[in-house]
Amino acid sequence: MDASAPRLDCTGTTPPIGYRQYHPDVSINFQCNRWVQWIGPSAVDEVAELAARADTYPELIDGFLGLAQRARGADRALAGAYYDRSAEFFMSATDPRRPAARTRFLTALRTIYDVTPELIAFGSGFMPAYDLRPERQIGPTILMFGGFDSYVEEFLPMIAGMVDTGRRIVVFEGPGQGSALEDHGLTMIPEWEQPVAAVLDHYRLEDVAAVGISLGGGLVIRAAAFEPRISQVVAFDILDDFFEAVARQIGRGVRIPLRALLTAHASRIINGIAGWAAARKPVSEWGLQQGMHVTGTATPYEFLRSTTAMSTGKISHLVRGDVLLLAGADDHYVPLRQLRRQADALVNARSVTTRVFTAVDQASNHCQLGNIGAVSRLIESWLDVTASVLDRDTAARTSAPVHR
């Protein structure tokens, strides 16, 4: 890994970028903050200007493609890469511009950080992975993966900062994610212990700390329930019921009746509701299209049925290691009630630590955008505390937060 490549400050030396108001649509505003988080302060005014004039996804796509071209022309390779990724994010799976935007993003990030993925065989395809090692390792090897719409390259500024502090990080994309999906056709599966086992086998790893980001916060609980080589678990953030999170984006009050309709196999009614929601909310249309693409399903009904399998309620009691559960007080994707529900379900975990980030932290939204450096510090300090303080022969349990 290139030591001169940009790092996200994980030490707290510089002020966090913060979470700003760019756009009145809460989901678009979240995505604007997402890309500014990785690019840095130079992106604030550019994104604000674009958000002020763009109200539709096509306008955002064209705007971010323009910013990417301008950034590349000014030798701002990192900004150009993330602007290409932001445009690609808003594109439909069938948009002819999508493959080129994705290729520019991946090529730029891999060049900037001087990394090349290994391909790990899984099922009918391959999963890309990176083994990023420090000069002198501190603590356990960290196994990291993303969620519903992520490329692991997106996290390289954060990962590089953590490697600088002595952490060895093995990060990979599993079925339904990034290049595993786009290049190798692997669609999402709920049995996340299977790709995790393949990665652990490939690198001959034991006694790892697993960090799951976004939807990965639910997948990591699933993996830890069935994979004994995971001894420490970080849900960044919690997501114990993916269906609940998806239903929340479709509309207020639809979760219970929608679940009943799924139980009744009312596909025609559900597809009609999905069409209504997609016409009303751009994020619903994007989520349904992307969801079908990620899961390899053909209809909204089939996609929504697949989300019901991504729940940790029935398997959380199988987790026996130390667990850190993170949440944002203002997360617009994942309701905060999932934090307590997930914590209460981990009845056999050796320890359970929870942390809710608020606006005071500038990290109160999904995955703590605005102050991801605080999360990196928390994860590292928690790993050190659980390794040095907790008696390995006890089953201590605490809900007291670990502070920065």
Q: PLM ranges: what are they?
A:
Residues 54, 64, 92-136:
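N-terminal cap/lid segment of alpha/beta-hydrolase-fold proteins
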Residues 91, 358-374:
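Catalytic histidine-centered segment of alpha/beta-hydrolase-like enzymes
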Residues 154, 185-205:
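Alpha/beta-hydrolase active-site loop
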Residues 158, 321, 335-345:
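Short alpha-helix in the alpha/beta-hydrolase fold that links the catalytic acid
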Residues 162-179:
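Conserved alpha/beta-hydrolase
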Residues 226-305, 326:
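Hydrolase active-site cap/lid region
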Residues 319, 325-327, 331:
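Short beta-strand/loop motif that positions the catalytic acidic residue
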Residues 344-364:
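Catalytic histidine neighborhood in serine/cysteine hydrolases
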